């Protein structure tokens, strides 16, 4: 099990190459390449014709630092309900898959479509998503990279609270994967999202099981908002979570998505904050093994 964290905040602040160097220097085994800026930043290097060369340059930095890209995160949202925009989003996901594979990732997290109200359109969303992930399969085989579906949430603006969305319930998530029936499509369990939708986190782990659960997004929150902060800064019970991972014999990596913790610190303290995140990760990782 590798200990990993994402490049998102450090990459935006210091550049992606330097983010990789910082993550390696802090002692992490791997990094999660954040590619979700591709849909909001047309000038991003991954959106240019030379994106393959840029991806190779990041791979060279990683190799020089002795660190691996264990997974990546594709651009999102993957749908807004407009055919032209959704096709453009699909093309970005495919490009992200290729770029991630070049950098060395064996897996990329791809959000399911959930632009419709889940409460009234759950079946329609399921049909859209099964077609969406099946459409990605040829690219999985071409680039030799797995796609990890993630459990989501929606926001009820009228009530001012978070509610269920695609794959937020463990049985539904498992049914998605069973129907897709491909070794290329697996589960990424977002720990924070699970807490926000009132799910029993250890039970979610056990329901997905060792075969389907192959990636994690680990972060903490106050059970009310998607804070993406470091474990032990919020209210999630990480002792029962790590015990469940150990129980099922989890064989994936332990990947943080806790960059809002890092965001609170000024530049000179970023390495120290990253070092603390690493130490917390090592502690949690030992509880899983």
Task: Describe each region flagged by the PLM.
Residues 1-4, 9-29, 63, 106, ...:
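Histidine-acidic metal/acid-base catalytic patches
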Residues 9-11, 35-37, 75-78, 112-116, ...:
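Active-site-proximal loop/turn and secondary-structure-junction residues that shape catalytic pockets
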Residues 32-58, 226:
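Glycine-rich, proline-tolerant flexible connector loops at the mouths of alpha/beta enzymes
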Residues 44-49, 85-86, 162-163, 228-232:
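Short glycine-enriched, charge-decorated loop/helix-capping segments at active-site entrances
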Residues 56, 60-68, 78-186, 196, ...:
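Active-site acidic/histidine proton-transfer and metal-coordination neighborhood
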